[in-house]
Amino acid sequence: MRTCLIALFLLLSLVAAPTVRASVPWERLPGVNLTEADNGLRGKAIEIMKAENCYYECPDTVYSCVTKAAPAMTALRMAGVIVRLLVDGKTPDDISAELRNRAKSAHPFKKAKIDTSGMPRVGPEGSSVTVVIYADFDCPYCRVVSPRLIKLQHSLGDQVSIVFKLFPVKAHGPQSVVTSKAGWAAQLQGCFWAFHDVMYANFDDHDDDNIVRLANKAGCDLGPFKTAWNAKDTKEKLRTLKREGVKLGVKSTPSIFVNGKRYHGLKTAAELRDRLEEELDLVGR
């Protein structure tokens, strides 16, 4: 009788077994280059997966969630973050902090309401995901992140749009207000994105004469551009944009919102892309 019960228990265990995988499905982790993840790194990744809880879809550790027969997409993304950051040399504490930031970015307590009408935009209005970046033409990191977001929009297509909000920061120098006013003048002339590109490509040449030269290079009509650049309405528009950003908690640039959700994570191309794809999953693409 005892032998029969043991046999029955083993049979039931086998029937239940398909709910768990034998190992992490490394090939399914988004944004992971498996050639960079040797066995030693994978072992470290598994340790972190066992220590971190999945923040959505699966109420268990990341490891338990990714080793199920049908792993939760959130867990797969979290595992991908872990591997990518280990490859980049981050510590377990760094990775834990980034995962917390990712959770806050994807599932905040409250979303911001941001008016994007009339703002510079790449991609269609009404896209599934709208990314708003508060940036400054004299901000060194904006020079990297804004073109990076535009490149991601080109890759992801019309599901995503990028909206640029001018937010001059005095710490970037007195010219930051001047270049932001020039940016709004370019927007009024319909040449903002070409101006955006030449301004960041010529980051160290933002005196007034060079701004005019770059506006001309961007195809702006210089007469109306100069008029708008120095107009009282342009100065007031910059004040309005600044007040709006401050009200949303923006203190530095670049600051990013994804469908009204403040982005707290790393601004590498891989992490930004993964966050945008996660948001597409959340809205059902």
Question: Where are these predicted regions, by residue range?
Answer:
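Bacterial N-terminal signal peptides
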Residues: I6-V15
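Positively charged n-region of N-terminal signal peptides that target proteins for export
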Residues: M1-C4
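C-terminal cap of thioredoxin/glutaredoxin-like
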Residues: M73-T74, V132-A135, Y141-Q153, K165, ...
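Thiol-based oxidoreductase modules, predominantly thioredoxin-like and allied folds used
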Residues: D158-V177, K232-K235
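N-terminal "domain-start" segment that seeds a small globular fold
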Residues: S23-P30, K104-V122
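Local cysteine-cluster metal-coordination motifs and their immediate loop/turn environment
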Residues: A51-T67, F137-Y141
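Immediate flanking context of iron-sulfur cluster ligation sites
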Residues: N39-Y55
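A short beta-strand-turn-helix
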Residues: N39-G43, I114-V129, H154
